[in-house]
Amino acid sequence: MKKMLVEFRDFALKGNVLDLAVAVVIGAAFGKIVSSLVNNIIMPFVGVLLGGLDFSDLSFKVGKSVIQYGAFIQSIVDFVIIAFAIFIFVKVLTSFIKKKEQPTEETPVPPTEEYLKEIRDLLKEQQK
């Protein structure tokens, strides 16, 4: 049992697992921010453009069940905005990484044979 706990601790404290945990927490917080942006800023403007339509209240009844398709539309808008924001973030991040990875142009090192030939020629001239 102790060995299993040690293995679990080692697994849980690896960089990748901690990075994933931090990413999940930040992602959840980011999702709340985007949902607030969509619900409180974007959708009211869309509603005004569409004649005062409030998407969150859109629904219809089937028997005793209520189908709230307005909430579904709201979720789709949330998803599109979150996906676009992540796309932009990844695109910017990869452009920074590519800039850092671009090798600096180094002067080509002459091959060893060329040096040897030059040394040979210099030695021949000195012997004359």
UniProtKB/Swiss-Prot annotation:
Pfam families: MscL. It is a multi-pass membrane protein. This is Large-conductance mechanosensitive channel. The chain crosses the membrane at residues 11-31, 70-90. Signal peptide: none annotated. It is found in: Cell membrane. It comes from Listeria innocua serovar 6a (strain ATCC BAA-680 / CLIP 11262). GO terms for molecular function: mechanosensitive monoatomic ion channel activity. NCBIfam families: mscL, PRK00567.1-4, PRK13953.1. Belongs to the MscL family. Homopentamer. Keywords: Cell membrane, Ion channel, Ion transport, Membrane, Transmembrane, Transmembrane helix, Transport. InterPro entries: Mechanosensitive_channel_CS, MS_channel, MSC/AndL, MscL_channel. One of its GO terms (cellular component) is plasma membrane. The keyword Chloroplast does not apply. Channel that opens in response to stretch forces in the membrane lipid bilayer. May participate in the regulation of osmotic pressure changes within the cell. HAMAP family: MscL.
